[in-house]
């Protein structure tokens, strides 16, 4: 049944909004790359399986980063897959370094860029503590903001630097690789950086940016709410406020609330059902429950979407637990 939103938009606008052309092009490319295998099952079945995988969010597993970040749906799917695969890290209370979290990301996307992981870690950690340990929940919610709103945050970093230096904030921002978000955090002696910028003026600039930005932006009303209790703020203070804001997490729709981060009963039940079908596997999983949530360190490249998709997405095995705050102690 067609949704009211679908009926309210012209066909071409709806197709563009849902990035249907992106998925059609990818499906055709995979069809051509694997035509010999697909000929055994039929083209109709291939397209059915492909678009089922897109709806289920499993189509991004083990794909190249350019595809993983290509659409908002792909980004949400990747965030959800990362959470489901590695919830056991939070359940067990394990604290990992930035490099270790990056290794986990690369299990799902082999060419995932280190720079994005570093940016997410900077939201959580102090300026001189990039090698310190982080809890799963702290990293995950910071990573969600950094990954999903990446282009928007690059523009925000440029706006912040302009405000800090007294430039006109109404000029068009063209973010570059040298934008403020890529730089080291300021030293403690840099009073101007520590003081930050006026929150109300900063929000006005962000509101104008959201109006003209072609990439995904957090809802302006929620951004205003996140900044409502401060008079001045730093750039990383702003990112931290976004990552901790309940409403922004709900609006993005990729992750559950922090209190429910370790709960996914449907996935756990399905995993148990699948494991029961594999002779000799249940005992080993029972002896080492954390092993079931980690995909292979060298996952195969997905050549055809209909082959591994219905199994790759159900790879998690824990149910309940709690997270720890970021700590510098050794695990």
Curated annotation (Swiss-Prot):
Residues 289-331 are annotated as: Disordered. The modification Phosphoserine is found at residue 319. Residues 1-225 are annotated as: Required for interaction with TPGS1, LRRC49, and TTLL1. Disulfide bonds: none annotated. Residues 1-111 are annotated as: Required for interaction with PCM1. The keyword Zinc does not apply. Keywords: Cytoplasm, Cytoskeleton, Microtubule, Phosphoprotein. One of its GO terms (cellular component) is microtubule. Its main location: cytoplasm. Residues 318-331 have a biased composition (Acidic residues). The keyword Coiled coil does not apply. It is found in: Cytoplasm, Cytoskeleton, Microtubule organizing center, Centrosome, Centriolar satellite; Cytoplasm, Cytoskeleton. Residues 112-331 are annotated as: Required for interaction with TPGS2. Interacts with PCM1. Interacts with TTLL1, TPGS1, TPGS2 and LRRC49; the interactions link CSTPP1 to the complex TPGC. Binds to alpha-tubulin. Belongs to the CSTPP1 family. Regulator of the tubulin polyglutamylase complex (TPGC) that controls cytoskeletal organization, nuclear shape, and cilium disassembly by balancing microtubule and actin assembly. Regulates the assembly and stability of the TPGC and thereby modulates polyglutamylation of the microtubule, which antagonizes MAP4 binding. This is Centriolar satellite-associated tubulin polyglutamylase complex regulator 1. The lineage of its organism: Eukaryota, Metazoa, Chordata, Craniata, Vertebrata.
């Amino acid at each position: 049944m067609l949704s009211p939103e679908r009926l309210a938009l012209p066909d071409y606008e709806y197709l563009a909004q849902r990035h249907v052309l992106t998925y059609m092009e990818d499906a055709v490319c995979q069809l051509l790359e694997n035509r010999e295998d697909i000929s055994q099952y039929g083209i109709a079945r291939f397209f059915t399986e492909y678009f089922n995988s897109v709806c289920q969010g499993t189509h991004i597993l083990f794909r190249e980063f350019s595809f993983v970040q290509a659409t908002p749906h792909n980004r949400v799917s990747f965030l959800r897959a990362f959470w489901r695969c590695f919830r056991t890290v939070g359940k067990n209370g394990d604290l990992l370094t930035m490099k270790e979290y990056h290794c986990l990301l690369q299990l799902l996307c082999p060419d995932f860029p280190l720079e994005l992981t570093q940016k997410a870690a900077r939201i959580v950690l102090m300026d001189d503590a990039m090698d310190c340990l982080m809890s799963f929940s702290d990293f995950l919610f910071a990573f969600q903001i950094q990954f999903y709103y990446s282009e928007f945050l690059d523009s925000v970093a440029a706006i912040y630097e302009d405000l800090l230096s007294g430039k006109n904030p109404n000029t068009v921002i063209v973010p570059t690789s040298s934008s403020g978000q890529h730089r080291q955090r300021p030293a403690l002696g840099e009073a101007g950086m520590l003081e930050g910028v006026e929150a109300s003026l900063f929000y006005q600039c962000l509101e104008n940016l959201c109006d003209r930005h072609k990439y995904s932006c957090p809802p302006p009303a929620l951004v205003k709410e996140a900044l409502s209790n401060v008079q001045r703020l730093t750039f990383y203070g702003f990112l931290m406020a976004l990552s901790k804001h309940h409403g922004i997490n709900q609006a993005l729709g990729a992750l559950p609330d922090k209190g429910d981060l370790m709960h996914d009963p449907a996935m756990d039940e399905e995993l148990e059902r699948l494991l029961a079908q594999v002779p000799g596997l249940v005992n080993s999983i029972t002896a080492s429950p954390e092993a079931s949530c980690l995909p292979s360190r060298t996952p195969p490249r997905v050549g055809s979407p209909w082959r591994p998709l219905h199994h790759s997405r159900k790879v998690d095995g824990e149910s309940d637990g709690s997270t720890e705050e970021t700590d510098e102690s050794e695990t």
